[in-house]
Regions:
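H-loop/switch region of ABC-family ATPase nucleotide-binding domains
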Residues: 201-202
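The feature captures the beta-strand-to-loop junction immediately N-terminal to the Walker
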Residues: 41-43
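Conserved ABC transporter NBD signature motif
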Residues: 64-75, 83
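Conserved ABC ATPase "signature" region
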Residues: 119-137
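Catalytic Walker B motif of ABC-type/P-loop ATPase nucleotide-binding domains
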Residues: 166-169
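Conserved ABC ATPase signature
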Residues: 141-145, 149
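Helix-to-loop junction immediately C-terminal to a conserved catalytic motif
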Residues: 56
Length: 284
């Protein structure tokens, strides 16, 4: 899906298995390119979380190669530090990611572990707090924050590392509609900065709005890796992976069928795009 010179992270022919378990990954190959917006889809146990842990170097494959910017990643500490500095993971449950007694201390933890100069640590922390609108929370204990606020802190943790790739595991889980909207605004901003965003989600409506590319996992294998529109048009893959079509996608298809609309025009992904799509369809 990406050009060779745009590839940041490459997983080539990788297999992984957990002890005494059939779950894992079977001979998968994926390239993550600069600035991509990717949705990782599939049922529970499909291999999405294992894929994320391999991408971040937390797990090691028993077969295949994992590369970052064209270089193989070994078990050396220097390799792993460089990898985790550039490939960050925002876990589903922020409670499991936050360890410090204040928001400021939490966000500074990563840069300090990189052994950066104090001035550079402060610069990164200030920038991350500002990006996530957390300046007013800097001295507050994270355990007293709401779920949405904790999610923002966990994202600020990763931003302070200044990564090139961020992996989000079920980022909309347990968030109310207002915080989902704030999260999507944040993702738009990060994407505008050229950061590669990879999101594992069960929310197909969110995936369709957010991503330009979809990777579908099932039984530890990749069923499909293509443009997000093509993912949701592949009925066989959706059935095998237990996925459904996004509501706005199904509605748009129905409108097109009923009005005889132009099949070459892209289907809308947002309410605003749907308004324009309806206007064009009504004219026909």
């Amino acid at each position: 899906m990406t050009e060779k010179n745009d590839t940041l992270r490459e997983i080539a022919g990788v297999s992984f298995a957990y002890p005494d378990s059939e779950k894992g990954l079977k001979n998968i190959s994926v390239k993550l390119g600069k600035g991509e917006r990717i949705a990782v889809l599939g049922n529970n146990g499909a291999g999405k979380s294992t894929f994320f842990l391999l991408c971040n170097g937390i797990l090691k494959p028993y077969e295949g190669k994992i590369l970052y910017e064209g270089q193989g990643v070994t078990g050396k500490r220097s390799d792993l530090v460089n990898l985790r500095k550039n490939v960050g993971v925002v876990f589903q449950d922020a409670e499991n990611q936050i360890i410090a007694s204040t928001v400021e201390g939490e966000v500074s933890f990563g840069p300090m572990n990189l052994r950066l100069e104090k001035q550079e640590v402060c610069r990164r922390v200030e920038k991350a707090l500002e990006e996530m609108d957390l300046h007013g929370y800097r001295h507050r204990p994270p355990q007293y924050l709401s779920g949405g606020e904790k999610k923002r802190v966990s994202i600020a943790d990763i931003l302070a590392m200044e990564p090139k790739i961020i992996l989000f595991d079920e980022p909309t889980a347990s968030l109310d509609p207002q915080n989902v909207a704030l999260l999507e605004d944040t993702l738009e901003k990060l994407s505008g900065e050229g950061i590669t965003l990879v999101v594992s989600t069960h929310d197909v409506d969110f995936a369709y709005r957010f991503a330009s590319r979809g990777i579908v996992f099932s039984g530890g294998e990749i069923l499909l890796d293509t443009e997000i529109d093509k993912v949701f048009s592949d009925t066989a893959v959706l059935e095998k992976s237990g996925l459904c079509k996004p509501l706005i996608y199904e509605m748009s298809q129905l409108i097109r069928e009923k009005t005889g609309g132009n099949s070459q025009l892209p289907l809308p992904k947002t309410i605003k795009e749907m308004e324009a799509f309806l206007s064009e369809s009504i004219k026909l």
